[in-house]
Amino acid sequence: MVRLREIPRTAALAWSPGSASPYIATGTRAGAVDADFSNETDLELWDLALEQEGGSAELQPAAKLSTESGFHDLAWTESEDSSRGIIAGALENGSLDLWNADKLLSGASDPLVSRASQHSGPVKTLQFNPRHSNLLATGGSKGELFISDLNNIDHPFRLGNVNARLDDIECLDWNKKVPHILVTGSSAGFVTVWDVKTKKESLTLNNLGRKAVSAVAWDPEKPTKLITSIPLETDPLILVWDLRNSNAPERVLRGHESGVLSLSWCAQDPDLLLSSGKDNRTICWNPQTGVQYGEFPVVTNWTFLTRWNPHNPNMFATASFDGRISIQTIQNTKSDAIAQAGASQVQPVDDEDFFAKAQSQPQASTFSLPTAPKWLQRPSSVSFGFGGRVISVGLTDPSKPASRTSKVRITRFEVDSILSSTTQTFEEALKAGDLRRICETRIENAQNDSDRVDWKIIETLISDNPKMQLINYLGFSSEVDETADSLSKLGLGKSEDGGANGVPESDSRGPGVKKHKRLSSIFDTHADSDNFLTDLSASKGAKTNNPFQIYTGSESEADRGITRALLLGDFEKALDICLQEDRMSDAFMVAICGGQKCIDKAQEAYFQKQLEGPNYLRLMAAIVGKNLWDIVHNAGLANWKEAIATICTFATDAEFPDLCETLGDRLEEQAKAEGDKESRKNAAFCFLASSKLEKVVGIWIDELQENENKAIQEATNGETSFSIHVRALQNLIEKVTVFRHVTKFEDAETQKPSDWKLTLLYDKYIEYADVAAAHGQLGVAERYLDLLPQAHPAAVVARNRIKLATEKTTARSAPAHISAASHLTTKPPQQPNVPRGMYNPSAPMTQANNLFKPPAPMQVSNPYAPTGASSAYSPAGYQPSQQHQPTVPLGGPPQAFGTAQQSNIAPPPRAANQSPSTVTSYTQATNLPAWNDLPEGFAKALTPRRGTPSAAAATISSPFPHQQPPQPSQSPQTISPHQPPPPRQRTSMAVPPPPRGPAPPRMTSPPAVGQPHGFPSTRKTSLNFKCIYPTTQHTPTGPGMNVPQIPRGPSPYNAPPTGPPPSNRYAPSPAAQPSAPQPPRAAVAAPPPTGPPAPAPAQSPYSYQHPPPAHGSYAPPSAPTGARPDHQPQHQPPPPGSSPVSRPGTAQSQRKPAPAAKYPPGDRSHIPANAQPIFEILSADMQRVKARAPTSFKAQVNDAERRLNILFDHLNNEDLLKPATVESMAELARALQARDYETAQSIHLDIFTNRNDECGNWMVGVKRLIGMSRATP
């Protein structure tokens, strides 16, 4: 609830019609006096300028016009003649004036449309018909009620008899559903319903004994319901009427402390009603249930007018006699934390002075609407959730929209079910490692040639010899066979059938090699030709019939040089001579004899000589010279397949990828330059063969876009552009994934911060992860996101989303039960320092180590445990005099089997069925309420609290009888379990009052009751305890007794408890309740024992030892066996008629499941008539307290309100409270309304004391409300 703008005027107001930027028209209020006592009366228009952020809160008028008289009321309606509409003013001089808003804003000299003077006195009220904007109703003095038509403004007609009534008509309102029905309210208390069509009176209501009517308003949706208000200080009421039963109001709304002056019922939400009045307050109600939602900031003078904005109900305006018109919103714009922080900065020094806080702290919004306004509510809504979920909200029963009960559904959503199945199948195949099957499936289902080729190439890479498979894929093995066949047709073979032995020549020379037939026929003329070389084989004494001469004399010089070089073994020189003489055949023969160096020299010379020769020689040169780069860089791209085949055949494994990549780069450049898609596809082949993922991905992404556009153009009715895109993306991701698996690709750039080669692929991975997550496949999405670099910004966000969505909520580990410990332990107990308490011992005391002591219980997390070492019984921030507070070591627990003690202070006996006692205290958190009383500091105490309370205070010394105390520092004197604190006169010096500071923490629950010595229990104590008074006392097993709790000093907000405290799930079991507080009893000091105490009588460790019958309600029991009666402390026996208390069972055994409530919490529509005053009065007073309470006490006030709501729920369900209690609570509410706090307090005490079984957590809220109401001005 934020104040948006302020208009510094005391004026009547009207909102502009239409949905344009809102304006407000103001007219100087008749009878109001400004601070400067000016007599000027003006009509002004104000532009709120809400679109300007941080604009000035106080506005300046956009138009201004002086008038002859002051205004009682203003109305603004739409008009065909004016875009901004017509403004009507009800003037004190009896004139009805109409102005053109457009002319006013433009500054025209004649904005007045008309002026009528039919009224004989002041015009008190007017309103345009909501259905027929040309009809205007005006009411004034002497019962004058006129209906005017703007089209004929000079001839209105009057409703009612002239002499019937002479009272003034103060207010009127047109019915929102039936346009010819009008209601008026008069100063004489008549509420009259008129039928304008028949010009007759239809119905008259008696307004609560004819009390004056200040405002009337029709229900926006129900034509028979209306609301009236009373302006009297004695009866500041709002009456809700249903005309179907007009004898009495249907509901009375009480909340204003003084007369109600104005009402405004929200047209967009009938559950919202504004009222303002003489108590300077503007209150928001639910008129359907009577619930007061809260009030807006209180001003310093009467709020005489409030109006909702007719088109934007988030805003409303309120006019008051302090000279301000406030434009506010019902939307909160500041969090509670900010508001609390702001309040803490202005908190007064004195926390006890409530009035100082109330005056110094700014009044802020004190409520929030429990449900969203109707214009923000939706009967159904839906939202997509991350992870393929759709959250939808719809009415449980659409046939009953008024029920407003909704159901939330979370369902799975898939944009494309085919995609989900495809992804699942693909992921399963990947896990199985069956890549070949994936490739075969994708080849069969390929939608275009490019995809088919890509998958075939990837399939070839899976084989054992990928190079040979690439050659086969290119078709070169069949071409070799075709060439051999064409050579055989030329007759170059020896025979058609075979060689000399009938075996095909190709078989004898190897597969695929055939003998040249023509050469064979040339050398077949000599029979010995085949055996020539055999005959020349080296053998000793070999002699043939073919002698020769090394020199014949006819040789050329070159022949002689070659011969001489051969004789000397100088093959290189012989080769040089052969090359010089261009004897290439001889050169090669010599080179063969000379070794590899000569061969290389001969080959080089040959290729140099054959530069202009056939192309195969260039190819041979590259192969022989191992310079395949010449083919890659210089071979024509039209023969890229031949180049790839050559590379596959002759390239080494090390240079193969680079050679293919270079050839692919040339093809890609050609594709970009010429726009040739075939070259791009060939480039993709080369990149795939070279396993260059970063190169082929760019081509695949381009193809993806092209294929997607083509598929969209050819799409059928059942396909959407998104599903087509997702399938194309799925195909891309599958190809990349399989390719990475086949090539064992490792991304070396995952640790780089930027400039990644695979940026395009990373973007697709992110997109695919989003699609997979949207289909509920979070694991798949996470796997692909893990492939991205760690520093990728989009990947970081996507990973976090996946992580949050897949993160399993770890169940909180339950507190471990304390297992039963062994009876024997040799570990001495730890003895920490005792926190300083209220009782000051004179000397430190210790306790002997107990060999039978059970181990200390495990430290279990306790949200109510105190922080630090503060005592649960001493207020925070208070430390008594240092000389009275020596540090005392904490003794061990009580002995289990009668072992001697050094201390004369023993703990109280523990029953056999009780758990080990634990002490909890109020936590330091400020958002948790106290357990039983008003917080200190809420109101100023009538008497200051003292560290040592008065002995005359009749308080209960210990509200938790069967518990072990939290072991504070104690006096050497033994203190009776029911002994009050020592009186002031016994102290050696006065204890100073505590310093000012925050309110002390209080215990949220009493400690658990005791357990038999040596037997720690694993069972939880019952939570159904309702009474803190002891019911029975059993014989203690030792001389120990309880330490009393420190009672509070007298305070109007923290009075001493005069009756049993409220029902509390941490309180002991209920029993017979005393009718009055117990008086303090004198303590009997027991001297320290001279020896080991006598052992307790044999008894079951799990049974009670009941006391003997008592002679009176306060008679002490007989002395216990084995104890000294002279020093036995006095205990209270059970009251007459009470039976011994059975052991409290576990929470599971005693606590019955609460029956289901008949109606949901917060429902107030079923509160019976006899309980309705309780609800109305307590709610109204609670809202009054909330409005004036300082912000620093927001938590305590909210807790009281929460507890009151528990009471209202019980009343609505008609459970827990009996009829007599309901009647008593009604009397309490009436006393509270009359400010009779003493009577309210006594009724509260009576219910608390005598009907405690009907008191739940709600009773504390009633008690707090009484105290707060008394402290609130």
From Swiss-Prot:
Bias (Low complexity): 951-961
PROSITE patterns with a match to the protein in the record: WD_REPEATS_2 (PS50082), WD_REPEATS_REGION (PS50294)
Region (Disordered): 489-515, 808-921, 940-1168
Localisation per UniProt entry: Cytoplasmic vesicle, COPII-coated vesicle membrane; Endoplasmic reticulum membrane
Assembly with partners or alone: The COPII coat is composed of at least 5 proteins: the SEC23/24 complex, the SEC13/31 complex, and the protein SAR1. SEC13 and SEC31 make a 2:2 tetramer that forms the edge element of the COPII outer coat. The tetramer self-assembles in multiple copies to form the complete polyhedral cage. Interacts (via WD 8) with SEC13.
Record family assignment: Belongs to the WD repeat SEC31 family.
Name listed for the protein in its UniProt record: Protein transport protein SEC31
Organism name: Ajellomyces capsulatus (Darling's disease fungus)
